[in-house]
Amino acid sequence: MLSNPIGISGGLDKHAEIPDALFDTGPAVVEVGGTTPLPQEGNPRPRVFRLPSQNAMINRYGLNSKGADHMSELLQQRVREFAYAQGFGEHELAEQRVLDGLAGVPPGSLVPGKLLAVQIAKNKATADADIEAVKRDYVYCVDRLARYADIMVVNVSSPNTPGLRDLQATAPLTAILRAVVGAAKGVDRQTKPFVMVKVSPDEDSDQQVSGICDAVWGSGVDGVIVGNTTNHRPEPQPKGITLPEQEQNALTQTGGYSGPQLFDRTVALVARYRALLDAPHMPEVAKRMQAQTAIATEAEPNREDVPSVDGGAPVDKYGGKTIFASGGITNGEQARTALDAGASVAMMYTGVVYGGVGTVTRVKQEMRQK
């Protein structure tokens, strides 16, 4: 059972250096990454711009990454230190015992009631048109990292990697996701990681959303994270209000926009994905997840007094695919609205950047008061 329905989105811990510190701030889900197979520098600096008057940001990091091997080493060391602390020893068998669940905690988060998501992407140098090469990039990441994750997140939606969003078309997306699902099923661990795909808020036409849903069902992934940063910019300021010159300049920068102004769009898109991913398609993966999980209707005495997600995986009350909402969520009322629209988890990034380490605690308190 997830202890609460709040998560921290990828980007705050790009290299999986501080997952435990992020868990300590209170979320039930922490997403690290995104990482690429090989190290890459990302885009030149400056590549992040703040808009304090809007509590918003524009970034064009370009998936700067130390590579999947580096992240794997960090996560493996984390598991081995946990195994030693729990009395399993410090050898390879001790690591395997923890990964197989003998410590009584999820093998990724290592914390009861919480899940670690690892976001993966292709290298910028890998040609978008070469789907076999793209698949190899994602599978390489799965092979290195899935042992240490509860959820693998397939990022095909960063606006800062040229051509990446083209992979959200139905045919290439289905092929990529099938490859990732197949690799995840082969992980040497008692329980296999779940697979989710992170989609763009800009791919929002009926045809695009429907095509992505077809790929989700056709590939067997377990859910969707809606969404990512957007290439769109907020509506102009009301008449008589002038942005500081620095922020006016920031709005002209190339990159993905994130902040509270995304919220309405995120909720609307969550509702659309929920409608399309509901019961009419019910292949075996949905039945499996429905049998394993559901939203808890009452908090257990030793659980946090916020909505809990039952089961060992991030799944909702709808009996189909899981949806995480990500984009513009900054308070408890918005988190509740995202859940009511069809999400199981409300994730935050920019809200945490501006709100600090107490943000998740505040949001959960606000949810309790509703």
Model-inferred region functions:
Residues 26-38, 220-233, 329, 335-364:
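Glycine-rich phosphate-binding active-site loops on the catalytic face of alpha/beta enzymes
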Residues 13-24, 136, 203-217, 308-318, ...:
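Catalytic cores of alpha/beta
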Residues 159-172, 208, 215-313, 355-363:
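Glycine/Thr-rich beta-alpha phosphate-binding loop at enzyme active sites
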Residues 48, 54-153, 158:
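Active-site beta->alpha loop and helix N-cap motifs at the rims of alpha/beta catalytic domains
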Residues 82-111, 279-320:
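Intrinsically disordered, low-complexity domain-flanking/linker segments in eukaryotic proteins
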Residues 1-81, 122-124:
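N-terminal capping/small domains of soluble enzymes
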Residues 42-55, 234-255, 339-340, 345, ...:
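C-terminal helical cap(s) of enzyme catalytic domains, especially alpha/beta-barrels
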Residues 10, 123-139, 165-173, 195-217:
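Active-site glycine- and acidic-residue-rich loops that bind
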